[in-house]
UniProtKB/Swiss-Prot annotation:
The gene is glpK. Glycerol binds at residues 84-85, 136, 246-247. Inhibited by fructose 1,6-bisphosphate (FBP). Key enzyme in the regulation of glycerol uptake and metabolism. Catalyzes the phosphorylation of glycerol to yield sn-glycerol 3-phosphate. Sn-glycerol 3-phosphate binds at residues 14, 84-85, 136, 246. One of its GO terms (biological process) is glycerol metabolic process. PROSITE patterns: FGGY_KINASES_1 (PS00933), FGGY_KINASES_2 (PS00445). Pathway: Polyol metabolism; glycerol degradation via glycerol kinase pathway; sn-glycerol 3-phosphate from glycerol: step 1/1. Belongs to the FGGY kinase family. ATP binds at residues 14-16, 268, 311, 315, 412. This is Glycerol kinase. One of its GO terms (molecular function) is glycerol kinase activity. Gene3D superfamilies: 3.30.420.40. It is an enzyme of class 2 (transferase).
Length: 502
C-alpha cells in the first residue's frame, strides 16, 4: 500500500542533525542522525560550519527516506526544529556564509553585552524582548559579525547580506533561496524582536547597528513556508510547513498549549518552560519571557528557566570523580541507601542559572560526616537536579500565579526512575513521562502536519499521545519541607564563592 503518508521532522541540534519519520499515528518509524564538527577558535568561543549543518541535515533527510523504504511522494510535509539563538549571516546572491555560525554557547560578545548594560539598555531589553542581556542571544552575535568580518557592514548596508537562525538557514536552503523566513519562537530569541507587538524592534536594531533588510519575515510556527524538491530538480515537491525552536517544539510535543502547563527537559542542562497563554508575564525572579505556540501554532507566551547542570553533574561523577562507570549506574548506587545521610551536592560548576543568576557561585558538597559514602554522594547529586527544578518551578508559579497540576518530562535523565520519583516527591506534583521520547521532533512534526491537514486538529493528536508512566508524589509533607530547607541552606553557602573578598 503506497498511499500511506508520513511526516518528517528535521531536528537540527547543537551536536548532531537528525531526521525523524513519523506515521499518521504519531509513531516514530525511522531515525537518521549525523554528528558534525564543534569549532573552538579560542576559550569561550563556539562555532559551527553552516555548510556542514546543511550537509548533515540534508543527508539525514535523504537517508531516513531510504532507510524506511518509502518514496518521496509519501511525505506529506516537513517540519523543522532547531538549536536556538545560533547565528548565521550569508550572501543573498551566492548563498555563501560570510563567517561560521556563532553558536548559542559562545561567549565572545560579553564586551558588547557589558556595554549594553553600562549604557542603561537593560530595562528596555527586558520589557521589549522578554530577555536578559546576555551573549546567549543572537543580536550581539550579528553585531560581532558585522563589526569583525571585513566589508560585512558595507555589504549589509547595501542589502546584500541575510541573517538567520538555524531554522531560517535550513528553509532558505531547502527552498533554494525562495523563502527567507523564521517563526515567532525563534525570533523571540534574537533580542531584536518586540514580543508584544510581534514585530522586529527598530530601536534594538538601531542600538546594535543592524540593517532591517537582513532580517527574515516572521511567520506562525504552523504554516506552509515553501516547497522543497527531494531528489533534485524535477523531483517531488514537498511543503516545508512547521517550525519552532527546540524548547518550544518540545513544549508543543508534550501538548502543553494552555496556560499553567509545563515541561522540563533533562539534558546536559535542564530547560523548563511554563505556558502562560496570552499573557506575557514579566518575571520578578530572573526567568525569561518567551514566545511559545497555542494549539493552532500561533504565538502565545511562556516563562523559561534554565539550569546549567543537569545530566552534566552525573557526567562529572563519571569522568572526574570516577565513582560511577556510566550514567545508568547512578540509579543503582542512589537506591542502595534510604536517604543522603544529610549530604547535599550543589553542582554550581559554572555558576548558577535561574532563579539565582550568580556567575560567582561554585560547586560544593555539604553535610559530610564520617558515615558518608559513595552512594550518598551519587544520590545527593541526582537529588540536586530535582531541587534545582523546584527552584525554577517556584519562581514560575510565583510569577504567573498558576499552580502546576503535573510536570511533563523528556530528555536522557528521565530514564532514571529514582530521579523522576524524587522529582515528584520534592515538587508534591505528579511527573508524567511520555511513551514517545523524541518530543522535540514530535512538536515539529505536529506543527507541520496540522498546517497541511495531515492531522485535522490537536484533539486528534491528544488521543495518540500516551503517558508511559506517572510518578505520584509521596504524601510526607514534613520530610519534603525539611529536605528542601537543607538544599536552600546549602545553595546559600555556595553563592558568591568566587567573589574577591576585600
Amino acid at each position: 500500500m503506497t498511499d500511506k503518508k508520513y511526516i518528517i521532522a528535521l531536528d537540527q541540534g547543537t551536536t548532531s542533525s537528525r531526521a525523524v519519520l513519523l506515521d499518521h499515528d504519531a509513531n516514530i518509524v525511522e531515525i537518521a542522525q549525523r554528528e558534525f564538527t564543534q569549532i573552538y577558535p579560542q576559550a569561550g568561543w563556539v562555532e559551527h560550519n553552516p555548510m556542514e549543518i546543511w550537509a548533515t541535515q540534508s543527508s539525514t533527510l535523504n537517508e531516513v527516506v531510504a532507510k524506511a523504504g518509502i518514496t518521496a511522494d509519501q511525505i506529506a510535509a516537513i517540519g523543522i526544529t532547531n538549536q536556538r539563538e545560533t547565528t548565521i549571516v550569508w550572501e543573498k546572491e551566492t548563498g555563501k556564509p560570510i563567517y561560521n555560525a556563532i553558536v548559542w554557547q559562545c561567549r565572545r560578545t560579553t564586551e558588547i553585552t557589558d556595554k549594553l548594560k553600562a549604557d542603561g539598555h537593560e530595562d528596555y531589553i527586558r520589557q521589549t524582548t522578554g530577555l536578559v542581556v546576555d551573549p546567549y542571544f543572537s543580536g550581539t552575535k550579528i553585531k560581532w559579525i558585522l563589526d569583525n568580518v571585513e566589508g560585512a557592514r558595507e555589504q549589509a548596508e547595501r542589502g546584500e547580506l541575510l541573517f538567520g537562525t538555524v531554522d531560517t538557514w535550513l528553509v532558505w536552503k531547502l527552498t533554494q533561496g525562495r523563502a527567507h523566513v523564521t517563526d515567532y519562537t525563534n525570533a523571540s530569541r534574537t533580542m531584536l524582536f518586540n514580543i508584544h507587538t510581534l514585530q522586529w524592534d527598530d530601536n534594538m536594531l538601531a542600538i546594535l547597528g543592524i540593517p532591517r533588510a537582513m532580517l527574515p519575515e516572521v511567520r506562525n510556527s504552523s504554516e506552509i513556508y515553501g516547497q522543497t524538491n527531494i531528489g533534485g530538480k524535477g523531483g517531488v515537491r514537498i511543503p516545508v510547513a512547521g517550525m519552532a525552536g527546540d524548547q518550544q517544539a518540545a513544549l508543543y510535543g508534550h501538548l502543553c498549549v494552555n496556560a499553567g502547563q509545563a515541561k522540563n527537559t533533562y539534558g546536559t542542562g535542564c530547560f523548563m518552560l511554563m505556558h502562560t497563554g496570552d499573557n506575557a508575564v514579566q518575571s520578578q525572579n530572573g526567568l525569561l519571557t518567551t514566545i511559545a505556540c497555542n494549539a493552532k501554532g500561533e504565538p502565545a507566551y511562556a516563562l523559561e528557566g534554565s539550569i546549567f547542570m543537569g545530566g552534566a553533574s552525573i557526567q562529572w561523577l563519571r569522568d572526574e570523580l570516577k565513582i560511577v562507570h556510566d550514567s545508568y549506574d547512578s540509579e543503582y548506587f542512589a537506591t542502595r541507601v534510604p536517604d543522603c545521610n544529610g549530604v547535599y551536592v550543589v553542582p554550581a560548576f559554572t555558576g548558577l542559572g535561574a532563579p539565582y543568576w550568580d556567575p560567582y557561585a561554585r560547586g560544593a558538597i555539604f553535610g559530610l560526616s564520617r558515615g558518608a559514602n559513595r552512594n550518598h554522594i551519587v544520590r545527593a547529586t541526582l537529588e540536586s537536579i530535582a531541587y534545582q527544578t523546584r527552584d525554577v518551578l517556584e519562581a514560575m508559579q510565583s510569577d504567573s500565579g498558576q499552580t502546576l497540576q503535573a510536570l511533563r518530562v523528556d530528555g536522557g535523565a528521565t530514564e532514571n526512575n529514582f530521579l523522576m520519583q524524587f522529582q515528584a516527591d520534592i515538587l508534591a506534583t505528579k511527573v508524567e513521562r511520555p511513551k514517545v521520547k523524541e518530543v522535540t521532533a514530535l512538536g515539529a512534526a505536529y506543527l507541520a502536519g496540522l498546517a497541511t491537514g495531515f492531522w485535522k486538529d490537536l484533539s486528534e493528536l491528544r488521543d495518540k499521545a500516551s503517558i508511559e508512566k506517572t510518578f505520584v508524589p509521596d504524601g510526607d509533607e514534613a520530610k519534603r519541607t525539611r529536605r528542601y530547607k537543607g538544599w536552600k541552606k546549602a545553595v546559600k553557602r555556595a553563592l558568591e564563592w568566587e567573589k574577591e573578598e576585600e
